[in-house]
């Protein structure tokens, strides 16, 4: 009897997971699977996901000044002028579908500048915990989400954080370029990775 109950619970768990993945894949015509195994989630699909539950979107910062020949915005530890333009373009596209979100960044010049240009005036909260890229980042995300359970969250962080999350949550190899992102959500105290954000 106990074995049957355990088997039944496992079956239900896998069924729920499969339903969730199917829902993500079927939410929009642009949704597909990346070569790294992550579902691709565009703006429209993200907006539909956000209707089901608040989403947490983590972006890598824009183009670094110290690793580019392009003109710097200001501080050499920050981003380039091209990076500001790219961040603003991404922010405009994102806000067209999801305008209501809380904005956070790690405490580096490049993430703060990226978030500022992305948001076009929205209040930015800097949180040094978002620079930590082990399990600590999950605790930070859950804490931020608990402060406003019904709000979407946008976080500007770093490539090694995104790489860690993709590997840890889905065993996927994710090497994000500038302003690439991941889509997550928090449910019953656990952080789930929904897929890779694709700006179309």
Swiss-Prot record:
Gene Ontology CC terms: periplasmic space
Disulphide connectivity of cysteines: none
CDD domains: HP
EC class of the enzyme, as a word: hydrolase
Gene Ontology BP, a term: lipopolysaccharide metabolic process
Role summary: Catalyzes the dephosphorylation of heptose(II) of the outer membrane lipopolysaccharide core.
Sequence similarity: Belongs to the phosphoglycerate mutase family. Ais subfamily.
Designated name of the protein: Lipopolysaccharide core heptose(II)-phosphate phosphatase
